[in-house]
Amino acid sequence: MNRVTTESIASTAILVVMVFLFSWRSIEAANVSYDHRSLTIGNRRQLIISAAIHYPRSVPAMWPSLVQTAKEGGCNAIESYVFWNGHEPSPGKYYFGGRYNIVKFIKIVQQAGMHMILRIGPFVAAEWNYGGVPVWLHYVPGTVFRADNEPWKHYMESFTTYIVNLLKQEKLFAPQGGPIILSQVENEYGYYEKDYGEGGKRYAQWSASMAVSQNIGVPWMMCQQWDAPPTVISTCNGFYCDQFTPNTPDKPKIWTENWPGWFKTFGGRDPHRPAEDVAYSVARFFGKGGSVHNYYMYHGGTNFGRTSGGPFITTSYDYEAPIDEYGLPRLPKWGHLKDLHKAIMLSENLLISGEHQNFTLGHSLEADVYTDSSGTCAAFLSNLDDKNDKAVMFRNTSYHLPAWSVSILPDCKTEVFNTAKVTSKSSKVEMLPEDLKSSSGLKWEVFSEKPGIWGAADFVKNELVDHINTTKDTTDYLWYTTSITVSENEAFLKKGSSPVLFIESKGHTLHVFINKEYLGTATGNGTHVPFKLKKPVALKAGENNIDLLSMTVGLANAGSFYEWVGAGLTSVSIKGFNKGTLNLTNSKWSYKLGVEGEHLELFKPGNSGAVKWTVTTKPPKKQPLTWYKVVIEPPSGSEPVGLDMISMGKGMAWLNGEEIGRYWPRIARKNSPNDECVKECDYRGKFMPDKCLTGCGEPSQRWYHVPRSWFKSSGNELVIFEEKGGNPMKIKLSKRKVSVV
Ligand code: GAL
């Protein structure tokens, strides 16, 4: 059975590629306009079912099949944000290589015969580091992000214009024959506008007119922007948008973000939004006259390297989306939504051009009926009751409507789809472990860093500095080091008792080393980032070293003035001396940015000569601040691959110099007694991210996606930097096997 299904998945993959090759067609130049019902592309009104796939969250080798899987799932458009900090790493220096090859990505969408929706932002939120804005911009004097000030407006406009010109040059906008039919400026500014005062309003207006002045020939939108000027379309984001009305009556109803799942944090539980509820929300939207709908995300993918926002957003951005992180359709969600899309599209013309009537069929029961002059008719029958199934009479026929469901009758008679009746197949997902292998036997090379300053200190100060202002996010790591002299007369030395170290930090995480020994870790969590550490310390007479490794785990990506949120230590003291508490906050602190191996780029193939590695077949366990390097063969087969890091502590990993990202198999824990996990999830009733959580007591993220295209046929260099200690002998490459059941 399993073998058969694996083979059938392989042949489906071949088919997907063939369909892709043959479905190439160029889209004709088409002007895009709109009225109160829908977009008009060329001369045709169209319903748009769009799939968000963020290009830097996968690799170019995956793009064609991701786009094709979205198309097979019944989507006719792909949506992505544009990721400013990936494209402009330093002012005026642009990058469009590798995962950031946006032109290549859009051309793949075009070749698949799909439309493209481009959300330029360039502020994007998106659980992406710093909301997509380059960190350097925060340090341009006078800049306040998303507000009415010259530096922000200058850099934001320059970038937007650069992108628009690039895409115009490549003829990617619909009037040029390209796939882009819609664009977005800013992102959900309406939530924050009031915090920015009168200037906020001015900025919103300015960004809309700046966008419109770009003359791209396709409409611009702003999501969740209630006072959006009439030159742009205000759109809706959320779990449900059936009640949404746009900013002016001549605008179509656009749902820019329907969240079919949710994101995850290190230490957080697994969100789950049932397919029935996602389908319900989509059917309600189209039933109520919505005409552009986008799944955020349809493929969430991976926050490779240090791209995740936060703090604490996991490296995986799976999002429980219809296509999973590894690029495989998630069943039954993908299949159920595919069936839904088919049912909706049967009535496309009526939905956008027919006459709409809404009436009640009884308590919590509604009919949305579309008719035209020729007598054709389509109906969406909804049961809004979140507990009781209902029988309804519609046009002399009785229909059974499960609680919280919508039935679609494309001829006002035949129920072709009900959102709560899932007929799609399900799947079983396994991560099949495979030991690391090498043709000449596994040889580990090990390099351990010493806690504290390596080389010379970067600077010395009699205070605790802000972490982010110091590193400017060039690294996660910042060493705060000092030393104290303990007199032989201290009573605790004689009594054998231990003084207590007390540290306060704005976040995000901290490893403590006393006299070059690892003492412990303290960390904030997803909702409360500042933290305190209180731990007994064994001090000796004479000099004692205190080396504190403060870490960021993804910078804040949303909220008013989010770019000013700091991180790092704010107070350090030790209690239990003869004279009481020793306050070290204003002691002499020596600082060092980054860890040594990072500075020497030990993760880059060929850079190994920079330090002296120790070769061993058995690498040490539980050793902090250690680099591991091992040459491996690619895993067998062709399934997608995840690095199993369950045996490790926290750190970063690379394959052949490509950044896999941060790993941290941190256990999903309860922060309050209400933080439960569910055994069964009831799809009925309004969904919230904490409604159907699972994974209590398990690592939030155990496997880390390593794209197949990163492997060479042999001699692959896997490099790991482990901060606190773990057991590298147990690291495995697991193959993701999905069997249809
Ligand atoms: C929205 C935002 C998206 C993303 C989403 C949650 O409010 O626009 O960028 O952050 O929330 O995944």
Curated annotation (Swiss-Prot):
Query: In the UniProt record, which residues carry a glycan?
Result: N31, N358, N396, N469, N525, N583
Q: Which UniProt keywords apply?
A: Apoplast, Glycoprotein, Glycosidase, Hydrolase, Secreted, Signal
According to its UniProt record, where is this protein located?
A: Secreted, Extracellular space, Apoplast
Task: Identify the tissues in which this protein is expressed.
Answer: Ubiquitous.
Domain of life according to the entry: Eukaryota
- Catalysed reactions, as listed in the record: Hydrolysis of terminal non-reducing beta-D-galactose residues in beta-D-galactosides
Q: What class of enzyme is it?
A: hydrolase
Keyword Hydrolase belongs to the record: yes
Q: Which InterPro entries match?
A: BetaGal_gal-bd, Galactose-bd-like_sf, GHD, Gly_Hdrlase_35_cat, Glyco_hydro_35_CS, Glycoside_Hdrlase_35, Glycoside_hydrolase_SF
Enzyme Commission code(s) on record: 3.2.1.23
| Residues forming the catalytic site | E188, E257
Q: Which PANTHER family is this protein grouped with?
A: BETA-GALACTOSIDASE RELATED
Q: What is this protein called?
A: Beta-galactosidase 10
Q: Which organism was this protein described from?
A: Arabidopsis thaliana
Lineage at the top is: Eukaryota, Viridiplantae, Streptophyta, Embryophyta, Tracheophyta
